A protein has these predicted regions:
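A short coil-to-beta-strand element that immediately follows conserved catalytic motifs
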Residues: 78-87
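Acidic, metal-coordinating catalytic segment for phosphate/diphosphate chemistry
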Residues: 1-30
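Short Gly/Pro-enriched turn/cap motifs at secondary-structure boundaries
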Residues: 20-23, 95, 118
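Active-site-adjacent beta-strand/loop module that shapes the phosphate/pyrophosphate-binding cleft
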Residues: 91-115, 149, 153
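Conserved Nudix-box catalytic region and its N-terminal flanking loop in Nudix hydrolases
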Residues: 35-74
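Nudix hydrolase/Nudix homology domain
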Residues: 49, 121-168
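Short, well-ordered beta-strand micro-motif
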Residues: 33, 104-108, 127-130
Length: 168
C-alpha cells in the first residue's frame, strides 16, 4: 500500500525511493561559436583524441545551459551569452558509458578581437575551422551533431536527434 500525502514523512520517503529507481542521464552541453567568416570554433582536448566543440559535461543537478557557460568560463575564460538551443541528441550507450543527453547551444558570432585561447589544462588548442574541414577533425558522432546544429541555426529551429540521426 502506497502512503498518501497526508503523512508527509512516509510520502517523502516513498517519493525518494521512486526517485532513486529512476534513470540517471549524463548530460553534455556544448556551444556552437562562429567567427565573422562562418567558421566554427573547435577545441582540442588533452584527455581524448580528436577535436570537439567547446563545452563539456554537466555536474549533478546543473542545468545544461549553465554547464555550457561554466565550461566556456573554465576552458576559454569567456562569458558567452547563449542565444538559444540548437540540438538535443539522445546518445545510445557505448563503450563503458551509459546513455546521455547532449545539447548544443548557439553561442553566436564572436568579434575578431575576441580571440580564444585555452585557459586550463583540459585543452591544448582552440581554433576557428571551416565547417567542411571540421568533419575531418571531430568524431563521426560529433560531426553529425555539429552538422545538425548548423542546419538548426540556418532553419531557425532546434533539432532533436537520436544518436546523431534525424528521422526517428
Amino acid at each position: 500500500v502506497s502512503p498518501t500525502p497526508g503523512d508527509p514523512d512516509a510520502w517523502n520517503a516513498y517519493l525518494a525511493e521512486g526517485n532513486a529507481k529512476q534513470a540517471r542521464k549524463r548530460v553534455a552541453a556544448d556551444v556552437l561559436l562562429r567567427d565573422a567568416l562562418g567558421r566554427v570554433l573547435l577545441v582540442n582536448p588533452t584527455y581524448k583524441p580528436g577535436w570537439d566543440l567547446p563545452g563539456g559535461m554537466a555536474e549533478a543537478n546543473e542545468p545544461p545551459e549553465e554547464a555550457a557557460r561554466r565550461e566556456l568560463r573554465e576552458e576559454l575564460d569567456r562569458d558567452i551569452d547563449l542565444l538559444g538551443l540548437l540540438v538535443v541528441d539522445w546518445v545510445a550507450p557505448h563503450g563503458p558509458w551509459d546513455d546521455q543527453i547532449a545539447f548544443i547551444f548557439n553561442g553566436g558570432t564572436l568579434d575578431d578581437d575576441q580571440a580564444l585561447r585555452p585557459h586550463d589544462h583540459e585543452l591544448s588548442e582552440a581554433r576557428f575551422t571551416p565547417l567542411e574541414e571540421a568533419r575531418d577533425l571531430v568524431s563521426e558522432r560529433m560531426w553529425r551533431r555539429l552538422d545538425a546544429a548548423v542546419k538548426a541555426l540556418n532553419d531557425g529551429r532546434p533539432m532533436y536527434l537520436r544518436d546523431g540521426a534525424t528521422g526517428w
